[in-house]
């Protein structure tokens, strides 16, 4: 990586956690990812969810159809785990290079997760098959019991689900997605080479005070929810350390403005347009730009056993204002950091 004062040149990054939705929303948001990233792990929580090879192939084609000419982008598809999923279907998709990984949503943990897994025991045959064939498990790590406080759900998941699972299936490769707590940062750092994590830009840049003090900011509301500043700091320190089993996963999750700005708003930040510059800002603030390229472009492929991208992009350090909104067919999207001045952006 070369780092003159105003330009950062890095190997083309990948996004290891992305929501593209479907229909008009898909067509609107895909270019914001495909112009920057070489690959992205695409989440399967559509309605209905992507649970078959056939559905994944069809969804992949809809994504590719939305990629503008001149963009070189490969969507990496995932299978949505359910209590009734056939292990043979999962293995077939993996062997045919349709499924790159499988996604575990605890039932009702987040958007379109009502079909999710009710207990680990219910999907043990599937997980055992994944361990056998070397297929990564991507985990939304929150318990969803009604009596557990929303700010405690990730920490409780580690002790009650994640650790027992990894003790039982010791060879299973696991990505602890969008970690938000010191508990998770410590757990991943102390884990072995079969455990990795992704972190979003919002969880590195903000804590729950930013979302709640002086008025509720619905465009910072995502799941897992922003935590207190000691957790934010632990995440920042983890990425700044150069730890190689943590990598870029934006969890970019678009919702139309009226679904975010409502009396019962949806969870998710549409950060695809601004995420890479946001990460660069954090690494610069932490005096860790020497680790930025690995976080964006090397650590993920290394964990997944994939080659790194062979092209490069440049970020430029000059102030730019983020658009207030992005047109959607009959509504608008509000991007992460809308209307704000940002320090780093991708050089066009």
From Swiss-Prot:
Cofactor(s) listed in the protein's UniProt record: Zn(2+)
Pathway membership: Pyrimidine metabolism; UMP biosynthesis via de novo pathway; (S)-dihydroorotate from bicarbonate: step 3/3
Catalytic activity from the UniProt record: (S)-dihydroorotate + H2O = N-carbamoyl-L-aspartate + H(+)
Cofactor note: Binds 2 Zn(2+) ions per subunit.
Keyword Transcription belongs to the record: no
EC annotation from Swiss-Prot or TrEMBL: 3.5.2.3
Enzyme class name: hydrolase
A GO cellular component entry from the record: cytosol
Keywords of the record: Hydrolase, Metal-binding, Pyrimidine biosynthesis, Zinc
Keyword Metal-binding: yes
Binding site for substrate: 19-21, 45, 140, 223, 255, 267
InterPro entries (alphabetical): Amidohydro-rel (IPR006680), DHOdimr (IPR004721), Dihydroorotase_CS (IPR002195), Metal_Hydrolase (IPR032466)
Residues annotated as binding Zn(2+) 2: 103, 140, 178
Active site: 251
Binding site for Zn(2+) 1: 17, 19, 103, 251
One GO-annotated biological process of the protein: 'de novo' UMP biosynthetic process
One term of GO molecular function: dihydroorotase activity
N6-carboxylysine PTM sites in chain numbering: 103
Subunit structure: Homodimer.
Function field: Catalyzes the reversible cyclization of carbamoyl aspartate to dihydroorotate.
Family statement drawn from the similarity comment of this UniProt entry: Belongs to the metallo-dependent hydrolases superfamily. DHOase family. Class II DHOase subfamily.
PANTHER family: DIHYDROOROTASE
Protein name listed in UniProt: Dihydroorotase
Source organism of this protein record: Shigella flexneri
């Amino acid at each position: 990586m070369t780092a003159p004062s105003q330009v950062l040149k890095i190997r083309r990054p990948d996004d290891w956690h992305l929501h593209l939705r479907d229909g008009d929303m898909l067509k609107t948001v895909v270019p914001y990812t495909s112009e920057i990233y070489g690959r992205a792990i695409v989440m399967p929580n559509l309605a209905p969810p992507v649970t078959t090879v056939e559905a994944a192939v069809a969804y992949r084609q809809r994504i590719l159809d939305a990629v503008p000419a001149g963009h070189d982008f490969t969507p990496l598809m995932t299978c949505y785990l359910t209590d009734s999923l056939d292990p043979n279907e999962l293995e077939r998709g993996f062997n045919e290079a349709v499924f790159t990984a499988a996604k575990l949503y605890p039932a009702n943990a987040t958007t379109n997760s009502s079909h999710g897994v009710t207990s680990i025991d219910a999907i043990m045959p599937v997980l055992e098959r994944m361990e056998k064939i070397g297929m990564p498990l991507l985990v939304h790590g929150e318990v969803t019991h009604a009596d557990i406080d929303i700010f405690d759900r990730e920490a409780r998941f580690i002790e009650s689900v994640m650790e027992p699972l990894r003790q039982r299936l010791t060879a299973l490769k696991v990505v602890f997605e969008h970690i938000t707590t010191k508990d998770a940062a410590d757990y991943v750092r102390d884990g072995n080479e079969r455990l990795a994590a992704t972190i979003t830009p919002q969880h590195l840049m903000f804590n729950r005070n930013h979302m709640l003090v002086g008025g509720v900011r619905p465009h910072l509301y995502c799941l897992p929810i922003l935590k207190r500043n000691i957790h934010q700091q632990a995440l920042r320190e983890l990425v700044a350390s150069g730890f190689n089993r943590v990598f870029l996963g934006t969890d970019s999750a678009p919702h139309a403005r009226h679904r975010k700005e409502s009396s019962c708003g949806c969870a998710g930040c549409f950060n695809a347009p601004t995420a890479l510059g946001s990460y660069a800002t954090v690494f610069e603030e932490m005096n860790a730009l020497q680790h930025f390229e690995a976080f964006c472009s090397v650590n993920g492929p290394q964990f997944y056993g994939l080659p790194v991208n062979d092209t490069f992009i440049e970020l430029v350090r000059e102030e730019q204002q983020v658009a207030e909104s992005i047109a959607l067919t009959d509504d608008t999207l509000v991007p992460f950091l809308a209307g704000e001045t940002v320090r780093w952006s991708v050089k066009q």
